[in-house]
Regions:
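Short amphipathic beta-strand and strand-loop transition segments with alternating hydrophobic
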Residues: 73-76, 154-160, 214-215
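Bacterial N-terminal signal peptides that target proteins for export
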Residues: 2-16
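Short solvent-exposed loop/turn micro-motifs enriched in small/polar/acidic residues
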Residues: 79, 94, 105-106, 151, ...
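Gly/Pro-enriched, hydrophobic low-complexity segments
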Residues: 38, 89, 100, 110-114, ...
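Boundary at the C-terminal end of the N-terminal hydrophobic targeting segment
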Residues: 28-30
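N-terminal mature ectodomain segment of secretory-pathway/periplasmic proteins
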Residues: 32-117
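Surface-exposed beta-loop interaction hotspot
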Residues: 145-151, 158
């Protein structure tokens, strides 16, 4: 009996040690995932403001393309998330439509949509931000900036993607109204630039893949992808954003990102 008791004690000790090791390993992977996310986010620091022209191509499963033109402006807010405004310039049926976004580090983001036909500004409720943005495969949630504090992170592995060594990090949105249960993010090891995101829907199915291409560096520090593609695996559609005429330090102020500025944006 003494030998059996000794064996049970050894098994119990081994079990406790395994649990402690698993906890430590889990914390290390979580911390590494967060560290990678923070380093990636630093690519967006200190740009002050930016502007660009955008082309949005909506491609259905038959390969037919609808093209829209936009102007995009962004303002850095050092103490919180960034502000942005996207204004449609063509075609005629969406001309003047604008979306204003205030990203926040912790609380839910604020978004407003201006519809010129109705001459009114409509606030987008948090629970509706998973819906498609004006017929594209991007959601309203995708059009807001992904602040580091909005997610829990776990480092998964290293993997080669497009001939680039990448970290693969899993992040889970803390927002209960997010359209995603989790996202897998590929971040290159050289510059900590996001290369690809797999988006999983509320049923944990792989809903969309987001690709970031043609990164270019501005003023020696600010990285801007000139192409972002969103592929919807459930409906076979794709949306592509093409960026051009990128400029930093335009002198924008908070006044350029107010609800009244939406009405002046035509």
């Amino acid at each position: 009996m003494k030998g059996l008791s000794h064996l049970k004690n050894k098994q119990f000790t081994a079990l406790v040690m395994a649990m402690i090791l698993a906890s430590i390993t889990g914390n290390l992977f979580a911390n590494k995932g967060l560290e990678i996310a923070i380093l990636s986010d630093k690519n967006n620091d200190d740009f002050i403001d930016s502007s660009s022209s955008m082309t949005m191509n909506l491609i259905n499963k038959r390969g037919e393309v609808v093209t829209r033109k936009l102007r995009f402006k962004r303002l850095e807010v050092p103490t919180d998330g960034d502000k942005s405004i996207a204004i449609f310039e063509s075609p005629r049926d969406v001309k003047g439509v604008a979306i204003l976004s205030y990203a926040h580090k912790v609380k839910a983001d604020d978004q407003w949509l201006y519809l010129p036909a109705l001459k009114r500004v409509k606030r987008i409720a948090s629970k509706n931000k998973s819906g498609p943005f004006l017929g594209s495969e991007f959601s309203f949630e995708d059009f807001s900036f992904q602040e580091v504090e909005k997610y829990d992170y776990v480092y998964l592995k290293e993997e080669i993607y497009q001939e680039k060594p990448c970290y693969v990090v899993e992040r889970k949105p803390l927002d209960p109204y997010s359209g995603y249960t989790k996202q897998l993010v590929w971040i290159d090891k050289e510059n900590y630039l996001v290369q690809k995101i797999h988006h999983f829907d509320r049923k944990s199915f792989h809903l969309k893949t987001q690709l970031f291409k043609d990164y270019r560096k501005y003023e020696g520090f600010f990285w801007q992808p000139h192409e972002i593609e969103m592929i919807n695996h459930q409906n076979g559609k794709r949306s592509i954003l093409l960026f051009d005429d990128v400029k930093l330090k335009n002198g924008f102020t908070d006044r350029d990102f107010s609800q009244n500025s939406l009405k002046r944006s035509r």
